[in-house]
């Protein structure tokens, strides 16, 4: 179907988002066209502001509007325990359970040779520097229970073995192949509680 150029560009823009195919992109484009102009401008402004005002924490790699982030800045947090997760959305999922009191390190990805992603392409070098510079007693590996997440956890645990830092892996109350962000608070809580040393 041929659309006027502004609609085609809008459809193409929506298709760049994960999980949005051509049909959904067309629906979203026409939905936006039916919105009030003030709502469209507010939506566009929210997108621009989020992109402009948010960055990654220089300490942990979590998404933040200040550096360091609110978690790294919290003096009540146990700085000796670092929970390693793949994405910022995993931090948000962990924080929902309101039980974990340590700090985080966000890898912003996982090792995936099939996609050409190696250890140097994610925040593993920053993790090693952080563990060298800070007094950390335990690293909790909370990567996703899929092939990439398991490979990443195994790689990090092998790297940390000589350091003497206790390395644990969250328990698998999470489904294999699942993502942390989709787990409910109870499942995450049980997985954290049942972590094991690796």
Swiss-Prot record:
Pfam family, one: RecR_ZnF
Zinc finger boundaries on the chain: C4-type: 57-72
Keyword Heme: no
Gene Ontology MF terms in the entry: DNA binding; zinc ion binding
Domain Toprim: 80-175
Protein's job: May play a role in DNA repair. It seems to be involved in an RecBC-independent recombinational process of DNA repair. It may act with RecF and RecO.
Listed name of the protein: Recombination protein RecR
Classification of source organism: Bacteria, Bacillati, Bacillota, Bacilli, Bacillales
């Amino acid at each position: 179907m041929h659309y006027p150029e502004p609609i085609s560009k809008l459809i193409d823009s929506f298709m760049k988002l994960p999980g949005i195919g051509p049909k959904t992109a067309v629906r979203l484009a026409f939905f936006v066209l039916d919105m009030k102009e003030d709502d469209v401008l507010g939506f566009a402004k929210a997108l621009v502001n989020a992109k402009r005002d948010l960055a990654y924490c220089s300490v942990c790699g979590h998404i933040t509007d200040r550096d360091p982030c609110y978690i790294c800045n919290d003096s009540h947090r146990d700085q000796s325990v670092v929970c390693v997760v793949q994405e910022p959305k995993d931090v948000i999922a962990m924080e929902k359970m309101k039980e974990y009191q340590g700090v985080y390190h966000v890898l912003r990805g996982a090792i995936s040779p099939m996609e050409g992603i190696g250890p140097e392409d994610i925040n593993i070098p920053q993790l090693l520097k952080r563990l060298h510079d800070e007094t950390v007693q335990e690293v909790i590996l909370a990567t996703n229970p899929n092939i990439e997440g398991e490979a990443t956890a195994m790689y990090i645990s092998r790297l940390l073995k000589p350091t003497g830092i206790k390395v644990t892996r969250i328990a698998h109350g999470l489904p294999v192949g699942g993502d942390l962000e989709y787990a409910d608070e109870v499942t995450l809580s049980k997985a954290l509680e049942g972590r094991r040393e690796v």
